[in-house]
Amino acid sequence: NITKILECIRERGFQYFVIDCGWYRQEGVPWDISMGDYEVSDILFPEGLEETVRQIKAAGLIPGIWFEIETVGKAAKAYSMTEYLLKKDGKPLTSYFRRFWDMCDPWVEEYLTKKVIGTLKKYGFGYMKIDYNETIGIGCDGAESLGEGLRRNMEASSAFFEKVKREIPGIVLENCSS
């Protein structure tokens, strides 16, 4: 499908082509409950993501990709890694079918560095669309108050985005949320 889209938009003045949510979706599992593991879908990219990115670049466009780095969907293996997820009253903070990474945890930073920054570098992405589709609520454990725990987690998220920019100079970050 991306190949057809690239043909349609060729020479129309676009600068970026962003692969949106679901690029990691496995067969029979909706994209919105499977974020967190970020393994490229063999179903959606049977020739691999490398080939798709090559086609995007060959069309004269800068390739981009979607991440929702701070959340984990219930179908992801990461959903059960509760030692690395935010908690409220000692239980994993869960909203509908999502949980949230503890962005202050060094293991989480290392994991996301591998999954997010590693993916961006490996495939040569020059644009990252960052989404956030769930409310985290009033706060989380880990500080003298739920609000302070939340503030610290958001500060760690911001630090991770700065790390992305340091590791990949010139990358464009689009931050959006619903």
Give residue spans per PLM region.
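Aromatic-lined carbohydrate-binding/catalytic grooves of carbohydrate-active enzymes
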Residues: 1-117, 127, 137-138
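Aromatic-lined carbohydrate-recognition surfaces of secreted/lumenal glycan-active proteins
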Residues: 18, 61-74, 155-178
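Short, ordered loop/turn segments at secondary-structure junctions
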Residues: 22, 133, 178
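Short glycine-enriched, charge-decorated loop/helix-capping segments at active-site entrances
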Residues: 38, 144-147
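Flexible, glycine- and charge-enriched loops at secondary-structure boundaries
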Residues: 42, 105, 147-154
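Phosphate/ATP-binding catalytic cores across multiple sugar-kinase/actin-like superfamilies
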Residues: 119-123
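Proline-aspartate-enriched helix->loop->beta-strand connector
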Residues: 124-125, 169
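Conserved N-terminal glycine/acidic-rich loop preference
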Residues: 125-139, 149-164
